[in-house]
Amino acid sequence: MQKYWWHKATIYQIYPKSFMDSNGDGIGDLKGITSKLDYLQKLGITALWLSPVYDSPMDDNGYDIANYEAIADIFGDMNDMDELLVEAEKRDIQIIMDLVVNHTSDEHAWFIEARENPESPERDFYIWRDEPNELVSVFSGSAWEYDETSGQYYLHFFSKKQPDLNWENPQLRQKVYDMMNFWIDKGIGGFRMDVIDMIGKIPDQLIDTNGPKLHDYIKEMNQASFGKHDLLTVGETWGATPEITKQYSNPDNQELSMVFQFEHIGLQHKPDSPKWEYEKELDVSALKAIFNKWQTELELGQGWNSLFWNNHDLPRILSMWGDTGVYREKSAKALAILLHLMRGTPYIYQGEEIGMTNYPFRTLEELNDIESLNYAKEALEKGASLENIMDQIRQVGRDNARTPMQWDASKNAGFSTSDKTWLPVNPNYKDINVESALANPESIFYTYQKLVALRKTQDWLVDADFELLETTDKVFAYIRKTKDSSYLVVVNLSDQEQDFCYDFERAEVVIANTELEPITDQGKLQAWDAICVKMK
């Protein structure tokens, strides 16, 4: 298998509004990110994925783009972006830009022209119909919005301020590739591609994802932009299977480096239900089956996967499947060890490395997220209780991931000097923050630091086979095996003691959140025990 730099990379995702505020306006910005590069270098990560920093009215926090080649005022300007690229490069950190080309903002020059001049070339950059069909928006309600100016409906799978682009138009596609090359010429390390599986949609046939021309478009994009460069490209593909992922990420196909698959994330809510109908407990046996499928069916050389628990759209993994009480640190380390020792490129979401948790939202006024607010409005109209809605939002709402990064125990967790931050700071910041994590050699941070270092240096993490072991329900154990060596990873995903008997003779500990001896002596795993050993 041909090796690429991203096989041994760990990527750190930054949500710019919430990372670090340099100018005291309560909103994170590019200068703030640059000021924290030394911290990220200490963690050891290879690249930063920046959620969108482009010019935007911020209807969906930057995923509604008005100008792809300008920076939103709240984040700074292009000089700040260039400075971030230069300073990151000095520290051997690549910058991965968020590519949002399923839709634009309705304030993008293309859409303004399309709306005002139905005869313009830009009109066909978007999808217009005389009558709507039954397609619905991800953010609730119809996916069609009537435009009084031109007397037609336009398609928006997200908010009505995010009109979908018409990828069947070759001029539109070329404009996208030109924009991508603008960023490639600036020296970025790649693209994370937002809902890329939607660009092949055929609305008249009710096809929203995985349309018949999807892979043709991605191949064309590859040839016209990043394919000539050694860049990381990762597609957000909610419906991907291992078979579909081979199509995207087999190097012979010349499409993408890897995808984000979300099958394990689906366990957060009840089967075939909206995300708001969340599961109160993790089904560990289902999690084992899903990871086993992805680790064994996406074979080495046939494609590549990403490994993640958190991102800007998901609840904090500790609040979902870990322990936010007495075992917070131990469960955070256990979840990290379990994930990072599989095959794939790991992604760390800001604050994950210090064990940040969900926010205790009490009222709708504390929220910012359009998805949560739209859901609450719709659910209230249908007679749901506010108490129940707030419980759901506290558990799975997107703002949980977006509260400000917790740097220290000072005002606003050291994120901002402002009297009001754009989202409230989690009240637990005095206990959970970077400063206290760095001061404690046993903190979650140093487990992540070690996992990042292992990924860079240990070839077996890329090459080794994966074998799931038969264990009790709450124990997740697997072996990574090459022709020369084998590594055993064992994690107790519960706060109860679990049986685990294995011949550990002459095993050498690689990383752990516990001691090996009690496990070998008693055949028992204590709450949230996690260990990786090299078998002799």
Which residue stretches match the model-derived regions?
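C-terminal beta-strand-rich structural cap/linker in extracellular carbohydrate-active enzymes
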Residues: 520-536
